[in-house]
Curated annotation (Swiss-Prot):
Protein family per UniProt: Belongs to the baculoviridae gp41 family.
Source organism (scientific name): Autographa californica nuclear polyhedrosis virus (AcMNPV)
Subcellular location: Virion; Host nucleus
Keyword set, alphabetical order: Glycoprotein, Host nucleus, Late protein, Virion
Quaternary assembly: Homooligomer. Homotrimer. Forms oligomers in infected cells, while selectively assembles as trimers into progeny virions.
Main function: Major tegument protein that participates in the egress of nucleocapsids from the host nucleus. May be involved in host nucleus-cytoplasm transportation of nucleocapsids to form budded virion (BVs).
Any Pfam family: Baculo_gp41
Region Leucine zipper 1 (LZ1), residue ranges: 201-214
Example GO molecular function: structural molecule activity
Upper classification of the organism: Viruses, Viruses incertae sedis, Naldaviricetes, Lefavirales, Baculoviridae
Residues linked to a glycan: T128
Protein name (Swiss-Prot/TrEMBL): Structural glycoprotein gp41
Length: 409
């Protein structure tokens, strides 16, 4: 590898002696050399045109166009090799990172700028040289496709009695372990290798087992059924609708009003907390939420309000603006008074008013639920191991015991 790399750099053109490398250079006078033993050619034209024809070093040194090029100095070759090899190794490493990024979505060694650079190169390649795709229609009608799917279901259906007792959506069967689990292990636990390793499959099965066991323990503790991802999907849909300024459907509106879904409650509480921090003197924690533009706006607004009035009077911008409007002659509107009265009455008469907890109490409650979940998780593992050992112990003597089913004593 070292000899090949040395030959590679030896055949490269010599380094540039000028700020740029013009494709065409014209010299208006002949070159003279004072080196001893130099014999000028018989005829040297007064105007010599040289073109960068990408020849190797040997052919360039023997051509007549090499009059304007300094002779190659081999003493500089180690320095060039060292500098060029650094960039060569960096390019190879970067290409390997790109391959790992596209193969297994590994971005651990890539910076955001590098990812943006990779995506830019990909977009440029797609735009300049798009790939032509031929679409072949396999089915003439939907009925043909349905018949094909029915035939595949019969051919690739249940293979044994254990799977025949289970439903189609049940993953606790050998077909899921043999088909779907290797793909999951190849994607997340194989380290970017081409061939699936046995350790990767075992690690994927272990992690999935722990995840399912913990979800079961958490569901029993929190008294919530196991489809826990439904809550996250509902929160994602709610957040998407809010970002798009779309109309909320009735089911999401009822979910928001019921306050039974913690993720939706956190979204609403976050928005209200940001408003309190911005305009009601709640603090400066909004710096972690706002972008640079809005952060500068809010800071400028607070500085201007503090310049107009003392900090004690302008901390709550709502009250300060209401006071200024009242001094200017504005009468409070009937709807504003009704809103304050209604909100106060709801806060007092609400059946959940006595359930208001402080932040410390909420944290202690969450910690208690997590401890209970871990306790149930540990007991599940103990019971599972005990039952598995009992089944193995019971199956050992039954292997040699004759079948007496149907006989009477």
């Amino acid at each position: 590898m070292t000899d090949e790399r040395g030959n590679f750099y030896y055949n490269t053109p010599p380094p540039l002696r000028y700020p740029s490398n013009p494709a065409t250079a014209i010299f208006t006078s002949a070159q003279t050399y004072n080196a001893p033993g130099y014999v000028p050619p018989a005829t040297v034209p007064t105007t010599v045109a040289t073109r960068d024809n990408r020849m190797d070093y040997t052919s360039r040194s023997n051509s007549t166009n090499s009059v304007a090029i300094a002779p190659y100095n081999k003493s500089k070759e180690p320095t060039l090799d060292a500098g060029e090899s650094i960039w060569y190794n960096k390019c190879v490493d970067f290409v390997q990172k790109i391959i790992r990024y596209y193969r297994c979505n590994d971005m651990s060694e890539l910076s955001p700028l590098m990812i943006l650079f990779i995506n830019t190169i990909r977009d440029m390649c797609i735009d300049t040289n798009p790939i032509s795709v031929n679409v072949v229609k396999r089915f003439e009608s939907e009925e043909t496709m349905i018949r094909h799917l029915i035939r595949l279901q019969k051919e690739l259906g249940q293979s044994n009695a254990a799977e025949s007792l289970s439903s189609d959506s049940n993953i606790f069967q050998p077909s899921f372990v043999l088909n779907s689990l290797p793909a999951y292990a190849q994607k997340f636990y194989n380290g970017g290798a081409d061939m699936l390793g046995k350790d990767a499959l075992a690690e994927a099965a272990k992690q999935l087992s722990l995840a399912v066991q913990y979800m079961v323990a958490e569901a029993v503790t929190c008294n919530i059924p196991i489809p826990l991802p439904f809550n996250q999907q509902l929160a994602n849909n709610y957040m998407t609708l809010l970002l798009k300024h779309a109309t909320l459907p009735p089911n999401i509106q009822s979910a928001v009003e019921s306050r039974r879904f913690p993720h939706i409650n956190m979204i609403n509480d976050l928005i209200n907390a940001v408003i309190d921090d911005l305009f009601a003197g709640g603090g400066d924690y909004y710096h972690y939420v706002l972008n640079e533009k809005n952060r500068a706006r809010v800071m400028s607004l607070k500085e201007n309000v503090a310049f107009l009035a003392p900090l004690s009077a302008s901390a709550n911008i709502f009250n300060y603006m209401a006071e200024l409007a009242t001094r200017a002659g504005k009468q409070p509107s009937m709807f504003q008074n009704a809103t304050f009265l209604t909100s106060a009455a709801n806060a007092v008469n609400s059946p959940a008013a006595h359930l208001t907890k402080s932040a410390c109490q909420e944290s202690l409650t969450e910690l208690a639920f997590q401890n209970e979940t871990l306790r149930r998780f540990i007991f599940q593992q103990i019971n599972y191991n005990k039952d598995a050992n009992a089944i193995i112990a019971a199956a050992a003597p039954n292997a040699t015991r004759p079948n007496t089913k149907g006989r009477t004593a």
